[in-house]
Regions:
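Short, Φ-rich (hydrophobic/aromatic) sequence segments
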Residues: 27-28, 71-79, 126-133, 184-190, ...
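Acidic, glycine-rich loop-and-strand cores that form catalytic or ligand-binding grooves
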Residues: 89-93, 97-105
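Short, conserved beta-strand element in jelly-roll/cupin
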Residues: 101-104, 119-138, 186
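Histidine-centered catalytic micro-motifs
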Residues: 110-118
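Catalytic core of Fe(II)/2-oxoglutarate
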Residues: 113, 124-125, 138-197
Length: 197
């Protein structure tokens, strides 16, 4: 039984095999045509580069590619694990989307406090999924300031948490190493999606 909101921020150490993490990092580094400066959603629901808020390089994983399929498998493994902890989480009319891979460079990269759900295009986001693709010995934590919780980047670890306003978080600057992560979101289907099905 979940009694406190911080219990919905769940870590799964070593959930994803090292080989998969290495494969994702290799895909990111060799497919530079997909790399862009990290973007954020602004008040107009547009995605823009705002270096005061986020400094990272990220790639959106293309649909119908082997990497997309691998990310989908990782999302299912992650959510299945989450359902063992959060038994009442929804399982119907939900889907995974917005797969991305990013790097926060050593001593440079960060993402200021934010939430992952806003009015507009991200309103259907339910849970965030972060896969840590490498170890960062110093810095680079995902920090939930209002919950007094820091999550250390460790290769193969998955972090899941709700996207709503109760879960503001930020990415600390990695000190010892660059930080590679893959991210995705579990979304509710929109009314339009439900009407079409």
């Amino acid at each position: 039984v979940i009694e406190r909101i911080d219990e919905l921020v769940v870590e799964f150490p070593k959930l994803i095999p090292d080989e998969w993490c290495d494969l994702i990092v290799e895909w990111f580094n060799t497919n530079k045509e997909y790399q862009r400066p990290g973007r954020v959603v602004n008040n107009n629901d547009d995605k823009t580069v705002v270096e005061e808020v986020k400094v990272a390089t990220q790639s959106i994983v293309p649909f119908e590619t082997p990497m997309f399929d691998l990310m989908t498998e990782i999302c299912h493994m992650s959510y299945d694990s989450y359902l063992n902890v959060v038994e009442r989480a929804p399982i119907e009319d939900v889907y995974f989307r917005d797969y991305s891979v990013r790097v926060y460079e050593k001593n440079v990269g960060f993402f200021k406090p934010h939430v992952d759900q806003h009015a507009g295009g991200t309103v259907y986001r339910l849970f965030a999924i972060i896969l840590y693709l490498n170890d960062v010995n110093e810095g680079g934590e995902t920090e939930f300031g209002t919950l007094n919780k820091k999550v250390k980047p460790e290769k193969g670890k998955v972090l899941m948490f709700p996207c709503n306003f109760l879960y503001p978080h930020h990415a600390n600057v990695p000190i010892s190493d660059p930080k590679y992560i893959a991210t995705a979101f579990l979304n509710f289907k929109s009314i339009d999606d439900l009407q079409q099905s």
